[in-house]
Amino acid sequence: MLQVEHLTKIFKSGDQEIIAINDLSFSVPVGQFLTIAGRSGSGKSTLLYQLGLLDIPTSGKVLIDDVDMVPVSENERTAVRLNDLGYIFQDYAILPSLTALENTVLPLLMQGYTIAQAEAKAKKALEKVGLLDRINNLPSQLSGGQQQRVAIARAIGHDPKVIFADEPTANL
């Protein structure tokens, strides 16, 4: 389960403080979806960065399976990010010199999978997003929507407990 308690994120710019997230609390049970909607600049991406442990909130808790991730060490947060979380970023930035398969395999290798394991998981993920027939294509040979699906395959390849998606269908 993902649980957020009194989450606040304040950015400082000189003498000014910009409150991006103010005392937010909610929980998302296992197997459930949560959609966050709001206008541009309302803090949606900032919230995802806090939830995904890519940034530290000013105050509050982010609990994954009842463990508060805010006070743990950066090494522990990195391990959770690599093993338990999947990310689909608004600007997905797949690597232009790698094929769809290689782009999907790379994060799995970083997580410690063998090449054979990583390729099998990557092919399964690419099949789920309908790109098994394009695994040898470079990003320049894929449409924007297909590139977005490679990013989705990367996010789901290791069967994460939680997936964070920032406008995941923007290019589809």
Q: Residue spans of the language-model regions?
A:
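ABC family nucleotide-binding domain
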Residues: 1-172
